[in-house]
Amino acid sequence: MYKNNHANHSNHLENHDLDNFSKTGYSNSRLSGNFFTTPQPELSFDAMTIVGNLNKTNAKKLSDFMSTEPQIRLWDILQTKFKAKALQEKVYIEYDKVKADSWDRRNMRVEFNPNKLTHEEMLWLKQNIIDYMEDDGFTRLDLAFDFEDDLSDYYAMTDKAVKKTIFYGRNGKPETKYFGVRDSDRFIRIYNKKQERKDNADVEVMSEHLWRVEIELKRDMVDYWNDCFDDLHILKPDWTTPEKVKEQAMVYLLLNEEGTWGKLERHAKYKYKQLIKEISPIDLTELMKSTLKENEKQLQKQIDFWQREFRFWK
């Protein structure tokens, strides 16, 4: 459908718009009520899933194109389904009409990390794969904030009652924190990105610290990507601040023994969550909100780019 027009479309590309698809840069920020020595985080969409429907004609066209295209590896091929990886395994594609009809859902899915695609690869994917789909939309968006700071020194909590899981590193400090469960509409991960890169890819990060706050949004929550973590707090509470020794002791216990929260009644949980917020001079989520606000238009352009009606060359 679009594969012969790739070069022509590329010539019309407004490079400054696509360049703005890159992650946001670092800068120092000061917010009212919070004195930040932490640099502004680098912000990006780190994962996307787009689903849509292939009609019979487009399914045949796409299958024919994919079977001869050298940048695509196909398997599990039948008349009503196929699986594929494209662009050096950076994109996963799945089509299954029978399963979609029986489960009453859309029949094609495309998964990728836009940070790993070049501008040319983005155009190729949109024009040769995604534009074949009808009734397409996002079912997953991952919003990633990368901090050049040691977030193990911070205390993370949510106002909502969600499951919290913590994994500790060899030094005894928190290395990964999960809020929620993986199959929920929102799943928050806070982890040591520098250590993760070293462990998984043996890649050495030059920064002294690199931590990521990643918010995985699915299904209906993708529509709220620009307002999805109001209940999250990443704090540096000073447990010695409360005047009452009993409150000091309780706050210290809650900060250092996560299991203690489960022993509190509902009103006590609310009281101490409020107190912990009050005794923290810093809440990094305020920095995250300001970063998101500053970059909201460019992030929206990324979303618009993948939608059928959007064209850079207009």
Swiss-Prot record:
Keywords: DNA replication, Plasmid. GO terms for biological process: DNA replication. InterPro entries: REP-like_C, RepD-like_N. Coiled coil: none annotated. Pfam families: Rep_trans, RepD-like_N. It comes from the Bacteria. Transmembrane segments: none annotated. Belongs to the plasmid replication initiation factor family. This protein is probably a specific topoisomerase involved in initiating replication. This protein is specifically required and may be rate-limiting for replication of the plasmid in vivo. The nicking site of REP proteins is sequence, but not plasmid, specific. This is Replication initiation protein. It comes from Staphylococcus aureus. The lineage of its organism: Bacteria, Bacillati, Bacillota, Bacilli, Bacillales.
